[in-house]
Amino acid sequence: NQASVIAEFVGPDGASVTLPGFWMQPQRQTCNQDCAVELIDPVGDPVWRIRFSPPLPGRYTYRVDVTDGGETRTAAQGSFAVQAAAGGTIRVGENPRYFERDDDSSFFPVGINLGWSWTGGRGTRGYQDWLRRLAEVGANYGRLYVDVPWFVGLGWRQPVDSLAAIQADAWRLDTILQTAEQYGIALQIVLVWHQGWSAYGGLPVIAPTDPARPNIAADWFSNPHNIQVGGPFQSAAQYFSSPEGRDLFKARLQYIVARWGYSNSVFAWELVDQADRIAPEDPTIITGWLQEMVAYLRQIDLYHHPITSGVRDAARLSLLDAVVLDFREVRFYQTVPIEPAGDQVLATLNLLGPLIQTGDRPVLINEFSLGPWFEPAQEDGLGTHLITTMWASALSGAGGAAASWWWDTYLFPRNLVEYLGPLAAFARGVPWNSAELQPVSVALTGDGSLSYQPLRIAGFNEAFGYMRPPDTLYRITADAIIPPPSSVPAYLYGTVYSAQFSEPQTFIITPPTDTRLIINVSRTSDRAEARLIVIVNDQPVA
């Protein structure tokens, strides 16, 4: 806060970019051969750095100005040449359901969660090995938390406003992003871990002791922002709602963007992983906080990385409606071992279908597994659910393949990351960002004669006033109705009473033979003259 460093770069096209510098303390890692114990210590004097990713090849000029004690001076100026520009930052594509890079090449995320490492995972060295193994199978995506106390904890050191206190964490993130760039992996950076701002109640089941896993019991009561442990805030709600708390987080954002915004290995900024768990007693707090932080990120991130946020419960996605996010994300966990797993493909498509129908931005499943409490090693040791979920999501119209959880205790120990290879190879051959991709109906056929039975569709939602997502299409296939009938209102509303609920229902079906449609109407309202209109293949039939 006592000095600032600003650099101006002018490119070969005459466009200028002004970037802030950042203060850093160089670090050095020391560990034994297998890095079971990782030590990160300061080395040398603190320095100011500026990081710039040139968007074009050619010659650039630069000038560095330093302001200290109210006086500004030019500390350096010169020029340099860039032989070839990198692929560039990832953004929403020409086809808004998918992603692309600045050079217009398609980017279709195929990867897994890589939330963190820890001492038992060989620290930073172990994380680098995971990135290497992902690259070996052709994956291009990972998801990293930078707000956990046992690995990269940018919000977990004291004093909470001290840059010096987070320099070991910053070294880890430097190293990880540089390694990710080497291997062609783009990382979604989770900036706020919800559990650090809520009360952790433990697991409802007993997790196995083998394989080893980090202790993730940290929560608000151990958060360094909590006044009970020396922080400045009485509650998590105060941090997210007060000007002091918001200014503190903006300062962290400013440092994050200045130090790591240059990297093409940053896929996106995820502000909060589960926004509905932050100050749930007053949802307007987190919605207002997200609106303010999204606007601030767009202001300071000149590379325009995509911005998103998530919720735990997909039914609470409306919490994010007022926030202008670049893409949507949802979690998908079944409840193994408490309940047996259901149809994984059908559940995946039912979750994604209503979100994809809007078509206004990409949708990703950012976490999935058979259970949210520990890895499904006993229930699915071969990882069959990984294949079905990733392929179902990739071919559903989502912006990328679903990303599994349990990287450290399931995917890598059992070498299940091999399943990413065929999907990654397939995805590389598809121009996702530019093609006009449309869903199609497919079916298996046989040589023998077939007999057909009537298909009865029932189980509609009988809640009065229930409104489905707008412009939803229902696809009737041999396997299922997508989205399910429970999302179809049982009532059809007219234009006189309850007109706000009036919406046409559209069903898409490809019958295998001549078919008769029968619609049963149990009763009509006696308060207004009702008339049902049925259109088949654009032709009125009733």
What are these regions, as identified by a protein language model?
Residues 4-5, 362-363, 371-374, 388-542:
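Aromatic- and carboxylate-lined catalytic core of secreted/periplasmic carbohydrate-active enzymes
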Residues 15, 60, 74, 513, ...:
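Short loop/turn segments at connectors of secondary-structure elements within structured domains
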Residues 2-8, 12, 18-83:
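Ligand-binding face of N-terminal immunoglobulin V-set domains in extracellular IgSF glycoproteins
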Residues 179, 185, 296, 302-306, ...:
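Catalytic-core region of carbohydrate-active enzymes that cleave or remodel glycosidic bonds
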Residues 8-10, 67, 100, 522, ...:
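A generic structural motif
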Residues 19, 75, 99-101, 108-110, ...:
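Short capping micro-motif at the N-terminus of alpha-helices
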Residues 4, 67-69, 85-339, 347-349, ...:
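Active-site mouth of glycoside hydrolases
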